Amino acid sequence: MGQLSQSQDLGAGLKSRHVTMLSIAGVIGASLFVGSSVAIAEAGPAVLLAYLFAGLLVVMIMRMLAEMAVATPDTGSFSTYADKAIGRWAGYTIGWLYWWFWVLVIPLEANIAAIILHSWVPGVPVWLFSLVITLALTGSNLLSVKNYGEFEFWLALCKVIAILAFIVLGAVAITGFYPYAEVSGISRLWDHGGFMPNGFGAVLSAMLITMFSFMGAEIVTSAAAESDTPDKHIVRATNSVIWRISIFYLCSIFIVVALIPWNMPGLKSIGSYRSVLELLHIPYAKLIMDGVILLSVTSCLNSALYTASRMLYSLSRRGDAPAIMGRTNRSKTPYVAVLLSTGAAYLTVVVNYYAPAKVFKFLIDSSGAIALLVYLVIAVSQLRMRKILQAQGGEIRLRMWLYPYLTWLVIAFITFVLVVMLFRPAQQLEVISTGLLALGIICTVPIMSRWKKLVLWQKLPLQNTR
């Protein structure tokens, strides 16, 4: 098969500030505000360990991904690297799985945003709000990558300001200088059954919840491929991922568990951040958090549209999807991939309404372990890509720490987590559903090979695609 440049038809419209803020937005998902209360209720104050372990995993994965992305920037990111390092079947499979993950995210995030807007304007039905939001963001993504970057820049900036304000407010309360509520100190970290009230098993369970909060950090490597200097942006984003996770996750969650009891009634339904605001007697706490969550899910929806379309475009350019999906418009935007990704997302909504409940549940569950499979593929790809680069005399400007020992440790850890999920009733169906979906995609490889006369089981030659 001929060698194709995966980004030759895409623009370089993303500026430095866009990529910088995208790298921050990638680790601040709506799950930080919505899902953290579930993890806290599971592990208590020891949820900090769960976020720490999950954060360390993401730091390792981002470092591995950055090593490959700096050497060969590509909008297909880890899917392309899996092509080259493991084999065509691996890049093909993980690429379609990743596209499917973000396709499912689109209607789910749109529905959350629509529910919030409906609570503000009850006269407008939820489905109409959902449709309008998705169409508006689809239109924005169709115009140019610069539009996506600009819109995401301001959404991310709002999220950053909100979290920093929350941390400052919480720090003032913890140190006893907050005049409107009688809260101070960090005694709540051990007052209700100790720091680890439910044991280490609960910490592991919470880690399975928190791990998926970080999904999206890898988007920056795809986005950087559409900038003028992708290697510099990737290095900067990777080097800053440690402090981003430390500030936005560890600091803000520390504020939460230090101020409110982990076993507070109604924590799951109210939410952890809103509970803190109400404890501090902040007026309109619900309205404030609804606004922040709305910004977060809109940002996530915007990124989901972008990421799904770029992965579909990359698959098309490599011959792993119909050629029409690789078409771009005058703005060098893959408009067919954007429209098809949006259409596929709404097809899942139709399935939800007209198909049996078990069918839609399988669709949702099938995305449950994709994040871990993506991380596993990145680790295995980096393990082999380093040797390929060295054999070809390629320059490795950014290196994974303690190679290959840390890489092997990450592979072993992810495998361990997948095995644990397989034997836990709460996550068992997710692993099985994701596995069945992956197996189904792999089974299409011979069909695709005959249809397009591709050799999907061979490795691609390594080349820089910028």
Name what the model sees in each region:
Residues 80-81, 87, 119, 189, ...:
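TM-loop-TM module centered on a large, flexible mid-protein loop between adjacent transmembrane helices
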Residues 74, 97-111, 214-227, 283-323, ...:
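Membrane-helix boundary/coupling elements in multi-pass transport proteins
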Residues 1-7, 80-83, 89, 110-130, ...:
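Helix-loop-helix connectors at the membrane interface of multi-pass transporters/channels
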Residues 154, 324-332, 372-429, 455-458, ...:
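C-terminal membrane-solvent junction of multi-pass transporters and transport-like membrane proteins
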Residues 5-10, 47-48, 122-125, 157-290:
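Helix-loop-helix junctions that connect adjacent transmembrane segments
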Residues 127-184, 215, 238-242, 364-377, ...:
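Membrane-interface loop-to-helix entry segments
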Residues 1-35, 40-46, 58-63, 75, ...:
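Membrane-interface "cap" regions at the ends of multi-pass membrane proteins
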Residues 11, 24, 34-129, 133, ...:
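Extracellular loop-to-transmembrane helix junctions
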